[in-house]
């Protein structure tokens, strides 16, 4: 006697129960084909990257992405085209090329200035090569020597000492010439500005001057 069968029969005979609704749900007792349809999804989800994509290296970008990175460069942005990147590279190349030219011109101007300074230093043989630091030291010594000479001339009262006369002589050349002519012809010296105002006339017309005297 089958115990399982008798138990099931006895249970069904004495305790009838309505069938539970979950027993009729298709997802619990559906056909086996449904599991076969869903199995590829789970398999692809559980596979490693090397098994899922055998054509590509593990962890590497697809060939299309690698080609785009090679064409555009590491600094390229998605919105930029190769032509724009080439133009940008050309501008950067020109900017880098202008640096050595500026440095060369600066070096040439400094060298020419030092050559002129060497010519101003006396008693230096023509075949002597002076470095920049030696040139500056000699120029400093020569300037100190000239300042010492000027100081000695000023102390001794030598009239030939150098003095920077910025003011013109009083009266100028024209007044000196007038004084010489007056002394030569025997005329009295010219009156001062106060005497001129008292005894002489102004620039007014004769009638205006007469009216002023009659008042």
Curated annotation (Swiss-Prot):
Q: Where in this protein does the record say Phosphoserine is found?
A: 109
Q: Where is the composition biased (Basic residues)?
A: 92-104
SUPFAM superfamilies assigned = HLH, helix-loop-helix DNA-binding domain
What does the UniProt entry say about where the protein is found?
Answer: Nucleus, Nucleoplasm; Nucleus, Nucleolus
Alphabetized UniProt keyword annotations = Activator, Developmental protein, DNA-binding, Nucleus, Phosphoprotein, Transcription, Transcription regulation
Highest taxon in the source lineage: Eukaryota
Q: Mainly localized where?
A: nucleus
Q: How is it modified after translation?
A: Phosphorylation by PLK4 disrupts the interaction with MDFIC and leads to translocation into the nucleoplasm, allowing dimerization and transcription factor activity.
In what ranges is there compositional bias, type Low complexity? 65-89
Domain bHLH positions: 94-146
User: What's in the GO CC field?
Assistant: chromatin; cytoplasm; nucleolus; nucleoplasm; nucleus; RNA polymerase II transcription regulator complex
Region of interest: Disordered: 53-109, 166-198
Name the residues that span the membrane. none
Q: Which residues carry this modification: Phosphothreonine?
A: 107
Q: What does this protein do?
A: Transcription factor that plays an essential role in both trophoblast giant cell differentiation and in cardiac morphogenesis. Binds the DNA sequence 5'-NRTCTG-3' (non-canonical E-box). Acts as a transcriptional repressor of SOX15. In the adult, could be required for ongoing expression of cardiac-specific genes.
Subunit annotation: Efficient DNA binding requires dimerization with another bHLH protein. Forms homodimers and heterodimers with TCF3 gene products E12 and E47, HAND2 and HEY1, HEY2 and HEYL (hairy-related transcription factors). Interacts with MDFIC. Interacts with SOX15; the interaction enhances HAND1-induced differentiation of trophoblast giant cells.
This chain belongs to the protein called Heart- and neural crest derivatives-expressed protein 1
